[in-house]
């Protein structure tokens, strides 16, 4: 799959394969909390999700990847990222 928008459900499944999980009961209202360990530290990132089928635009996906060090610079190519799950 080429680099492009993803549904929230698919994004969550891809992140799970990299050890980043959605923390249940966290976040306020339409926000959901992603949690992962980066360089030995627990990292949290809130993201908007009104429903599971919402598409996340490329800039949001890029920000999430940077936050959890899942970029090409960190050794994870676009192809490897998008072909997970």
Residue ranges of each PLM-predicted region?
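Basic nucleic-acid-binding interfaces
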Residues: 1-28, 33-85
């Amino acid at each position: 799959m080429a680099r492009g928008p993803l549904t929230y459900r698919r994004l969550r499944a891809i992140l799970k394969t990299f050890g980043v999980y959605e923390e249940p009961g966290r976040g306020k209202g339409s926000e959901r909390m992603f949690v992962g360990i980066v360089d030995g530290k627990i990292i949290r990132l809130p993201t908007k999700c009104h429903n599971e089928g919402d598409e996340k635009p490329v800039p949001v996906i890029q920000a999430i990847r940077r936050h959890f060090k899942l970029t090409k610079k960190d050794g994870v190519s676009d192809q490897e990222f998008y072909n997970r799950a």
